[in-house]
């Protein structure tokens, strides 16, 4: 089968061998813009590439791309199915919105974490903001809210508060609050990706992605992070690598599952 394609670049006409990307070769058509990454010059005639990014100007969202990895299998068609599927408002989605609000307020609000009264006041204010921001969404829920939901909200706040207070500034994570950025957005023309991280150090060397849902479990026992979440974090690291020439090993990344709470590196 076909193992190479020709292209015009700043270095003239090139013949690129990519035998490991046969599916990509079937998609290519004349005049299609591509980014060619990881090119190796084996000799004057033969060049190989690690990756070929098709139509990089069409920026794909990292979260949407990672969501193509389903528990029942992986498929690129899932991207289009998710785009046309009706958007539902569910309790897990609202819990995720609340977790993001708690994270924002705990990082940005000057508060003595050892002062229980001040922390409780912050929780009430943060919860009030969350409900005011999501009044319409809550009115569209199919299921009524009960006491267990509010218990979960309070537990989520406590878990995030404890992690922001103790885990973030630790040497392991490396996120002192004074140098922490919330929800920075990036585009990466090289990879054709766009995305918004949850938490990042100002020096780009530490990332935390907040997850309010479940990690991988087996009969109630934690097994590790979900595959699609690992892919999401890996793509964020690749964006930093190509945008800022950051060595991959210099970026620490963590998936923070607030319901447990647990950090996965």
Describe each region flagged by the PLM:
Residues 1-3:
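Structural detector for short beta-strands of small beta-barrel domains
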Residues 71, 99-100, 199, 236:
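A residue-level signal for conserved active-site and pocket-lining positions in enzyme catalytic cores
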Residues 47-95, 101:
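Extended, charge-rich, solvent-exposed interface segments
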Residues 91, 95, 149, 228-232:
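Hydrophobic (often cysteine-bearing) scaffold residues that line and stabilize catalytic clefts
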Residues 24-50:
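Flexible glycine-rich surface loops and low-complexity tracts that mediate binding to linear polymers
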Residues 7-30, 34, 175-265:
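Mg2+/Mn2+-dependent nuclease catalytic core
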Residues 96-107, 237, 241:
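Short, amphipathic alpha-helical segments that act as regulatory/interfacial helices
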Residues 102-182:
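A non-catalytic, helix-rich entry segment at domain boundaries
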């Amino acid at each position: 089968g076909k193992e190479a394609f020709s292209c015009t670049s700043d270095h003239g006409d090139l013949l690129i061998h990519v035998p490991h990307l046969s599916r990509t070769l079937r998609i290519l058509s004349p005049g299609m813009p591509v980014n060619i990454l990881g090119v190796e010059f084996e000799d004057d005639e033969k060049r190989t590439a690690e990756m070929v990014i098709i139509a990089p100007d069409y920026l794909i969202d990292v979260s949407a791309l990672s969501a193509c990895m389903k528990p029942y299998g992986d498929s690129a068609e899932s991207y289009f199915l998710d785009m046309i599927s009706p958007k539902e408002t569910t309790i897990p989605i609202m819990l995720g919105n609340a977790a993001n609000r708690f994270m924002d307020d705990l990082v940005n609000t000057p508060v003595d974490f050892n002062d229980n009264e001040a922390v409780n006041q912050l929780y009430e204010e943060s919860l009030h903001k969350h409900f005011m921001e999501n009044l319409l969404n809550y009115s569209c829920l199919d299921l009524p809210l009960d006491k267990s939901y509010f218990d979960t909200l309070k537990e989520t706040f406590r878990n995030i508060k404890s992690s922001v207070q103790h885990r973030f500034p630790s040497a392991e994570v490396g996120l002192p609050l004074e140098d922490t950025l919330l929800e920075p957005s990036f585009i990466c023309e090289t990879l054709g990706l766009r995305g918004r991280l949850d938490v990042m150090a100002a020096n780009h060397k530490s990332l935390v992605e907040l997850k309010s849902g479940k990690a991988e479990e087996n009969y109630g026992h934690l097994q590790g992070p979900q595959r699609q979440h690992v892919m999401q974090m890996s793509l964020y690291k690749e964006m930093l690598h190509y945008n800022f020439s950051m060595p991959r090993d210099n970026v620490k990344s963590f998936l923070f599952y607030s319901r447990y709470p647990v950090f996965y590196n």
